[in-house]
Amino acid sequence: AEGLRGEQPARVSEVLPMLTAAGRVPWCADGFLLAGRPSFTFDSDFHAGAYYVQEAASQFVGCLLQGVPTFGARILDLCAAPGGKTTLYASLVGRGGLVVANEIDRRRASVLADNVRKWGTGNVVVTTCEPHAVCDCEAWFDVVAVDAPCSGEGMFRKDPAARGEWSENNVRQCAARQDDILREAWRALRPGGTLIYSTCLLYTSPSPRD
């Protein structure tokens, strides 16, 4: 769970009664490991945006930005849905910053927008542009984050259906798509800015080589 800034694990259950924290996520100051999975559907705090639930590994992007001046920064989250990393960026930049969260799939963008509204920071704009369109803001963003669409080997552990969707052809298509996205992302990044690239892959071959 992410979003309980300044709290200690022992107090999480006092602040949010539906949760029991087993400890902190080592690489995310606002992240907590949950002792069990509660029924989020019935938790009013979850629906109010008091916290967001995501894999601990997804919160590692915050560690990558340590030492990068993010307060007041402009961040482009180019492949943003469902919004877990977007909420983290929104917290990092503060009210004086801006996060542009882009998702080309309108159905997924709707989920993204809902999560952004719940988070309530007021510094996120959700767009549904192709990468080349949103990246026409050349050299404008301080940070560009690409959580690239991939062949999804990292999902095998928690989603058995993902194994059946895997194919060599899908890997090749994803690699080509990633290459296009990265080239556009680079255009949008200001000189001296920070580019974050992540996938849920177990192998290096589907990722761009140049």
Show where each model-derived region lies.
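Conserved class I S-adenosyl-L-methionine
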Residues: G72-C79
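Conserved SAM-binding loop of SAM-dependent methyltransferases across substrates and taxa
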Residues: P82-G94
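Helix-to-beta-strand junctions that scaffold the AdoMet/dcAdoMet cofactor pocket
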Residues: G94, L189-R190
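S-adenosyl-L-methionine
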Residues: A113-D136
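A short acidic, Gly/Pro-enriched loop at the edge of an enzyme's catalytic core
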Residues: D136-V143
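Conserved small/polar residues in nucleotide/adenosyl-binding loops
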Residues: Y203-D210
